[in-house]
């Protein structure tokens, strides 16, 4: 009890310090917020919103059930998951953060996954998309599509290895069968609900991107690669202008893309709110994904730099 009270006190003191900083530097923070909102309007929303609508529509129309027979053997043998879980993995790899987690939560809500299966899936299905890794990081930062392809390959391999490491998660707990049987809605109803829910999710994503963009802005003044490391741990979109175009930058890019940042973690927490799914499996999975990505990048860097 005393420990909890002490932690609560420390958190309140930190928040009070942040509030004082916000008040003392309001003009600069406003400028940073404008930059973040511009980033959301110009990059985040165009990159994510169409994917969110389509993936939501696919899940509602039974894409997981359609894919299940073809993915059943692979998902069961490697990850101890049903075939429909493959849709969350594939859509997460194509659509980017936080579409994998959103698809997993929808599969759980529709009754296609048990809670234990959904927790296991959350450890490795939430990933960055190839456009960000290949175009933004590879071509934009390192001036090489080949380097971007290596970043994407490392990201995918690390995600699959993370799934293998956590395939035993929840093994000792009783598995409760899903309580809801799948019933596909009509196409107009599925489309309307997908757009509506995606708009709400997009608003939440942009809110977290903006807040963390402002919060970590002082960290950009850190020397050398420390700025990229600190910023990448908080918000992924703010990382790109800070990465050095060398082996160190490559390791940081791979590791931070695997981790996703506190902003992505908060986006995932918002998606899981009300689903009865804990955030802990996703947190452990992203920490593992980031570490494995950095290790694989260290090995690949000898051929690239």
Regions found by a protein language model. Name each.
Residues 46-103:
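Membrane helical hairpin/interfacial module
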Residues 78-142, 230-245, 250-275:
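Alpha-helical membrane segments and immediately flanking helix-loop junctions
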Residues 23-34, 60-64, 135-137, 145, ...:
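Transmembrane helix-loop junctions in multi-pass membrane proteins
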Residues 1-13:
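N-terminal membrane topogenic signal
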Residues 63, 191, 195-261:
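Transmembrane helical segments that form the transport core of multi-pass membrane transport proteins
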Residues 35-43, 69-80, 109, 193-200, ...:
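Short amphipathic alpha-helical coupling elements at transmembrane boundaries
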